[in-house]
Amino acid sequence: MKARFALLAAACALLLSSLPVLAHHSFAAEYDGNKQINVTGIVTKVEWMNPHARFYVNVTGADGKVINWNFELGAIPVLLKQGWRKDSLKEGDHVSVVGNIAKDGSHSANARNVTLPDGRRVFGGSSAGDGDTK
């Protein structure tokens, strides 16, 4: 009886410990697949690290107000297969980004495609799809 209880407790602990991992990888939990954003601006910061690379872009709105957008990219191995390199984006680069905005209303998005300063359009490694935009 004690062995069965210990086994059940261990199984429950394992199951519960995996929930944060599942939540982390849920595009639908954080981003709205039906709401795209298409912006152009200046890169202010690049974070090339796992589990997902990120970059930040200052975008000037029609009212002249500058908003700093936070864009999530895919995992580093996925980005490397898509042609990304650690130095593909640098602070000061002028880029265009198509992505899906965060559900929480913040200035965050999952980058689907990024047009780099040299004109190359690269897939952002989004878990939302293959990079095709609507």
Regions found by a protein language model. Give the residues of each.
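Bacterial N-terminal signal peptides that target proteins for export
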Residues: 1-9
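Short boundary/loop segments of OB/S1/cold-shock single-stranded nucleic-acid-binding domains
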Residues: 22-37
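Conserved hydrophobic positions within beta-strands
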Residues: 41-43
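Short aromatic-glycine-enriched beta-strand elements
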Residues: 49-59
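OB-fold/S1-family single-stranded nucleic acid-binding modules
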Residues: 102-126
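Short, structured beta-strand/loop micro-motifs enriched in basic residues and often containing a Trp
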Residues: 73-81
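Short nucleic-acid-contacting surface segments enriched for D/E, G, S/T with interspersed K/R
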Residues: 81-96
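Bacterial N-terminal signal peptides
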Residues: 9-20
